[in-house]
Amino acid sequence: MMKIIYAFLLIAVVAFMGSGIMAEPLAEAIAADKPGQAKEIGIFDRITELINWLVNH
């Protein structure tokens, strides 16, 4: 039950970050971590990463 609550909270945070307030600095930070593979981060990519993390833990 707690995993479900945490999942919804994390999705809310990811949605807030993806709304444009944090999207640009976050995209630049990830692009800096992966030279030559700069990509724009979409909200669905973040949700997919969250779901994969929840499944693996």
Curated annotation (Swiss-Prot):
Q: Where, subcellularly, is it found? A: Secreted
Tissue expression: Expressed by the venom gland.
Residues of the signal peptide: 1-23
Residue span(s) of the pro-peptide? 24-31
- Cellular component terms (Gene Ontology): extracellular region
- What GO MF terms are annotated? toxin activity
**Keywords, A to Z?**
Neurotoxin, Secreted, Signal, Toxin
Q: Which family does it belong to?
A: Belongs to the formicidae venom clade 4 family.
- Job of this protein: Probable neurotoxin.
Q: What is this protein called?
A: Myrmicitoxin(1)-Pm7a
The organism named in the record is: Pogonomyrmex maricopa (Maricopa harvester ant)
Lineage, highest ranks first: Eukaryota, Metazoa, Ecdysozoa, Arthropoda, Hexapoda
